[in-house]
């Protein structure tokens, strides 16, 4: 969440940032936070005065008793009792204000960096790089018309999966429901090969591998910002009050909740392979066909914790890492800098990676790489101690490297030939075969 210091000292900047994100009633939300904080501070000021007064009376009581002034001592005791009652009331007012303030701050999103483009929707996202051509200033999703084509009709991955017996969508419906496919034979082997390839590449890049739980408590969900913002999209086990994770970002980042790191140990670089679970309420049509949008899927996540001074450099390294994976998989891609209106609730800046599906005639998102500035760290109380022994909030960053479903779809669709489906060279050591036929 945003810090009170930022909200109170740079109020106009915060309001403008929230408006850039198209957050409704930005000014009212900020003013409410300031008003609640004022109530809290006023209660604290009154409480401090009462405690000081009570301390003064307490000191007098002993002196009066020694002097034999029992009546005056009893009167002082009565005053102390009144002050204690007033102090208890103020403690309650202050605690309620703090609780209300925290709850309210959790409903206010992060503010975007200056370099985040203006815009209200995906059409306004800026294309900053592509494997297809040089990008020009003004290139956006809305006006981008460059796509790969070889002039041959291509089958979509759901037809290829059936043709080569790789994925059974109907069997998944029988076992669980829509959005839970069953991978079979070389389809399962391809999935496992990608997981091993992505983890191996992350290890080479210096990431420490983590194997976290796939269920988390509410505190973890609040720490990274999925709660309360995305509660409706998460699977919740009410009996135990636990949530299935939508991404490894949640458990891996929460490792550092309520932790003070040493600056010399930064950046922290972790990666994790997990199953991810998302309700995806409201999705329909071509968005959910085949592997396009699932309720359960495999993903490798990279997570970094860094200092404010070095987080932009960390972000650049993460972007380069994800781009390198797409190059090795020989997939046509483009990189988008998301506009304010299309950014997530918690991010300060985000880049999406998309690969093109000729068979579907559309771009498919395969990764988002975000810098959250201090937004998550403030919720998590994730801090570091610098060389001067000063404790400060860290910056947190994460990204998909990569999410498997659409990568599998792209590999099947882009590499189909008359003889079968060609496996990208970088994957062959992991699959053990060069063709699916």
Question: Where are each of the predicted segments found?
Answer:
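N-terminal alpha-helical targeting/anchoring segments
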Residues: 1-141
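TRNA-recognition modules of translation machinery and tRNA-sensing kinases, especially anticodon-binding
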Residues: 131-437
